[in-house]
Amino acid sequence: MNLKKVHHIPIIGSNYEQSKHFYVDLLGFSIIRENYRPERDDYKIDLQLDGIELELFIIKNCPKRPSYPEAYGLRHLAFAVDSVENTVRELNKKGIITEPIRFDIYTGKKMTFFYDPDNLPLEIHE
């Protein structure tokens, strides 16, 4: 087996404008492609940031996350940052609420969580 890296991470959102604004305008992802899929009546936006590719699907009437944040499947996305404090300040200036900064008990590194418009947990970690 020759797995090299994660190719892309798909995310399902409920609101096209809110999700696009959050990931592009607030977090700084750039748009690679943006497509409406009439056969599914949904949108697919491919985003990229520093080698990370997200597929953002906007699908009407999907069920909400079943629990916070413990549910089978993907638990959250974690982004590496140089400084959690600086990143928290930047997020807060943009109106994004973050949880209190804490230390990862296994690595001793600072970390915290914030949430996308559909309450997908996102982590920043030094």
What are these regions (language model features)?
Residues I32-E34, R40-D42, L56, N61-S67, ...:
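A short, acidic/glycine-rich surface segment
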Residues I11-E53, K93:
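Core segments of cupin and vicinal oxygen chelate
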Residues K5, D41-Y43, G73, G108:
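Exposed loop/turn and edge beta-strand positions of beta-sandwich/beta-sheet ligand-binding modules
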Residues M1-Q18, L74-L77:
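N-terminal beta-strand motif that seeds the catalytic metal site of vicinal oxygen chelate
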